[in-house]
C-alpha cells in the first residue's frame, strides 16, 4: 500500500485553500463521508447504522454505480443524506487529461440528474445556482482540473481524517484508531461503502457512531 496521511497536514490545507478540508465548528459536530458507492448490501448496511443514531452523512457516489443501482442511490436521498459527485469511473486526476476528466464528471452528472430528487444537495438551488459537491478519487487533482471544476459550480470537498478502511494491510483495530485519535470538532472523515473496505467499515462505523453519540456529538451532512 502506498503511503498516505491519516490526518491531513496543515500545509496541504494552506496550499489548496479553495478546497474544503474541515468545517470549523465550536459545536460537537462531525461529518461522516462515504466514497465509491452505491454498493449493494454495503450501502444499505451503512444507511441502517446511520439511522440507529439519527446520523446524517454525505455519500460521494460514482456515476456508473448510480446507473447500475439507482434504487440504492434514491434510498440515500430519501433518508435525507447529502450526495456528491465522485466521477463516473473513479478516475485518478493525476493520470487523466483535464478535458477527459471534466467529461467524466459530466457523464456522472447525468446519473445524478436522472435519479436524484429535489431533496438531493447536489441539485438544491442556492441563490439561483446549483449547489454541487465533488470529491476527487484518491484526492488527486491538478490545478487546472480544480479551477475548471469550481467554474462548473462545484464545491470541492476533501477531508481532515482518513480512516484508511481501504488498506488491506492494516487491522480493523488500527483503522478504528486512525479515526478516534484524529477527530476534532468539525472533522470531515472518509469511509468507503465499497466491497474492498466493507470488513473494516463494519467494524469501525458502529463503534464511531456509538462512542461519539455518547460523547454528545451530532453527525451532519455537508451542505
What are these regions (language model features)?
Residues 3-94, 100, 104-114:
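Active-site beta->alpha N-cap acidic-glycine motif
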Residues 71-74, 98-105, 171-177, 202-206:
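Charged helix-capping and loop-helix junction motifs
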Residues 63-66, 90-92, 140, 162-167, ...:
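Short histidine/acidic/glycine/proline-rich micro-motifs that form metal-
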Residues 12-18, 137-138, 169-170:
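Short gly/ser/thr-rich secondary-structure transition/capping motifs
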Residues 34-36, 61-64, 85-87, 136-138, ...:
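A cross-domain feature marking catalytic cores of carbohydrate-active enzymes
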Residues 47-56, 60, 82, 98-143, ...:
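CE4/NodB-like, metal-dependent polysaccharide N-deacetylase domain
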Residues 180, 184-196, 200-223:
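Catalytic grooves of carbohydrate-active enzymes
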Residues 140-181, 216-223:
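His/Asp/Glu-enriched short active-site or ligand-binding loop at hydrolase and phosphoryl-transfer sites
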